[in-house]
Amino acid sequence: MSSTPEQAKNKGLTFRKFKDGDNKVHWNEWIFDADHSHKCPEYMLSSPPCQASCPAGEDIRGYLNIVRGIEKPPVGMTWQEYAFRRISEANPFPSVMGRVCPAPCESGCNRNQVEDHVGINSVEHFVGDWAIQNNMKYTSTAQPTGKKVAIIGGGPAGLAAAYQLALKGHACTIFDEHELLGGMMRYGIPGFRTPREVLDGEIQRILDLGVQTRMKTRVGSDVSFDELEKNYDAIFMSMGAQSGRPLPVSGAEAPNCVTAMAFLRAFNDGRLKHVGKKVVVIGGGDTSIDVATVARRLGNITNINPDKARPEHVIAGQVAHDVADISARQGAEVVLVSRATMDKMNANKHEIEHALQEGIEIIGGVTPVAVVLGPDGRATALRVAEFEVVKGETVLKPGTERELPADLVVSAIGQAVDFTGLEPFDNNKGLIKPDSNYRFPGKPHIFVGGDVIRPHLLTTAIGHASIAADGIDAFLRGHTELDKRPKVDAHRFDMLRKLVESGHPLEEYNHKQSWGTSSAKYAVHNFEDRSSKYVIPANELFLGHFPYVDRNVREMTSLNAEQALGNFEERLQLLSEKQVVDEAKRCMSCGLCFECDNCVVYCPQTAVFRVKKSDVTTGRYVDTDYTKCIGCHICADVCPTGYIQMGMGE
């Protein structure tokens, strides 16, 4: 008999393989190999990785199960509305986020271990658009508390906080320096990615809850922070980071060297109608792609007075372009420069691909060295070079410097918070550092959220607002100490709420001593909710249950360089209702029963059985007769979702 190299290393083995007294298998492994054990199945609710990966904390598994028809809506409600209600418990902007969120939930999706992630973003997009088309409204059943909350900033964090607090019965007033609400959703993202009618519709739903606004009002100058503290019971600070960071190189003070935030604001305000012949953008994230694609669409106008209509004058707010001039628009050469190589850029991959299709040149792996100035002090080129990082320092590679001609240079290398009038809150790094409940240390009535904590995703700002709103609500109700947030801080399936909703509320506990019971109606038997602290990995699922199914992918209108010029139409196309339902069916419902019947079919003792149809609800589809169960763990082995765990008896 031949031996493997690994076996040859085991010198303790003889031809008998085991010494006298050795056990072939350790006793604590018997449960996994024997045909019976002391353990019996229990039904354990875990969080799926998509929810744990969602900064907004959406109950993603929940609304996918609604769309696919597993979790039934209340009588008289469509599945579309029920899915919308479930999404908006965490996120009041499903239509916007379904379009622009980079979907970290999809990166975490366990379905990636089968073939491809579930198109979570596309389902949210469909549900959000359906809600707008069908005029869905938010309603609050909470009694007014008489408490007032001031919200500084009307961007995603401020609006989401106002929404959550209004649902809890508190009166909210948003203070914003702009003419319109929306923050980065309006002024930082172009309209061909977030159509303004969609954004306006989702904002109006929040205002319809009774939220008040003070527009064109800057806290710190138009109204003092002291006034807010005097007139309001709590304050939520969500000013955003809408000031761009200039290039840290010589020549960056040139008037035609501008920040991405200023560029996008001028475009979204409707003031900027065209750019120069040659535009160079420095960045690598989604904002830099937005700037580049906007510049490609705006194009260049040659026969125009340059002193009157230079882009930098418009961006600085000195003048606005005349809409009559755009008929003479010609294509602009747009180059995007990134320190990261193209495969490692932070921008969404499909956005990079579309930028290339539209004729935008992307140069990765180079760093800005200097802005080259002409005799008039304006930028004429950006000097770049290849580099390497040595001990944290950028070292230029000799002989790799080159100049990229430019009559407009746009820096998209980061954002900053303007603390004018609010300087005491600056942590000397241009940000605010709150505690884990997003409360400002030493100020129990002040909470913080959004890019003032750390410039990040829109969905992150929405998640901050949800957590902060819980803290504000607790504070306003007299709780000075706030509860510790759960490890998995997301909106989750609530078994008790579902039992009430489906007409099966638990009975009152009679407080009488008795032996263990599986028939009393005052408890949910053999069920454990670990969703606040446990995320179920793919290796705890029965992946063999799931056949290969192609993802339903949204179509994206592809434009070449000529077609992109002057084209401000939305590119992302909605899935059909059938496609959305089919896509939701690809969800593996990680950590929660999706009623496949595997456990019932394969149980050799017929111990696992379906609950009576009149008593069925989500998560209570099957039960176990423990007088028959021998602990063979077959039901757990064949459970596709990992909902059945061999725990009872430990």
Feature locations, PLM:
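Ferredoxin-type iron-sulfur electron-transfer modules and their immediate structural context
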Residues: 1-148, 196, 235-253, 374-375, ...
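Beta1-alpha1 glycine-rich phosphate/pyrophosphate-binding loop at the start
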Residues: 25-27, 49-51, 58-75, 84, ...
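Glycine-rich dinucleotide-binding loop and its adjacent helix/turn
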Residues: 123-143, 201-221, 244-328, 427-443
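Generic beta-strand/beta-sheet core signal
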Residues: 152, 175-177, 216, 237-239, ...
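Extended, hydrophobic alpha-helical segments in both membrane/secreted and soluble proteins
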Residues: 156-161, 172, 243, 281, ...
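Flexible loop/turn segments at secondary-structure boundaries
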Residues: 181-182, 222-223, 243-246, 265-267, ...
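Conserved beta-strand-loop-beta-strand element in the redox core of flavoprotein oxidoreductases
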Residues: 215-235, 373-402, 619
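FAD-site-proximal beta/loop scaffold in flavoenzymes
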Residues: 255-279, 297-300, 306, 371, ...
